[in-house]
Regions:
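Hydrophobic beta-strand scaffold positions of dinucleotide-using enzymes
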Residues: 53-55
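Rhodanese-like catalytic fold shared by cysteine-dependent sulfurtransferases
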Residues: 2-8, 17-39, 44, 51, ...
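Non-catalytic accessory regions used for complex assembly or targeting
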Residues: 12-14
Length: 133
């Protein structure tokens, strides 16, 4: 009887440790960016004051038209130039490109560089608001 009780306690302890270990292994908070809609990005632009709009298209594409107050940094230059252009890694950064593909790549690269508040909102092709040249 004592042996059965001891085995039961050991089994419960082992299962508890296994459950805790499993929870801990799945609780890996990986940093990531947030994908938002153009409408959500516009709301942020209209209501917030402390943010950066980052256009990750080429210089030529940027010159053809961009969102007002956007800063241009080609997505291919993120890893080499982002820290000089964007020194505050906690700043809210709104990222876009032409169609949404490059902005996702750029947003991911920014997160890998340690930026903590990155929101990607697709491409200027889907931007229904003002564009400046």
């Amino acid at each position: 009887m004592k042996l059965l009780k001891g085995l039961t306690i050991m089994l419960i302890l082992n299962l508890s440790l296994f459950a805790l270990t499993s929870c801990q292994a799945n609780n890996t908070d990986t940093a990531s960016y947030e994908q938002i809609s153009p409408e959500e990005a516009k709301t942020i632009m209209d209501t917030e004051t402390d943010y950066v709009i980052l256009d990750v298209r080429t210089v030529d594409e940027y010159a053809e038209g961009h969102i007002p107050n956007a800063v241009n940094l080609d997505h291919e230059d993120i890893s080499s130039k982002a820290e000089a252009l964007l020194p505050d890694k906690d700043a809210l950064i709104l990222v876009y490109c032409r169609s949404g593909r490059r902005s996702k790549i750029a947003a991911e690269a920014l997160v890998e560089l340690g930026y903590s508040n990155v929101k990607e909102f697709g491409g200027i092709n889907d931007w229904p608001y003002e564009i400046v040249k």
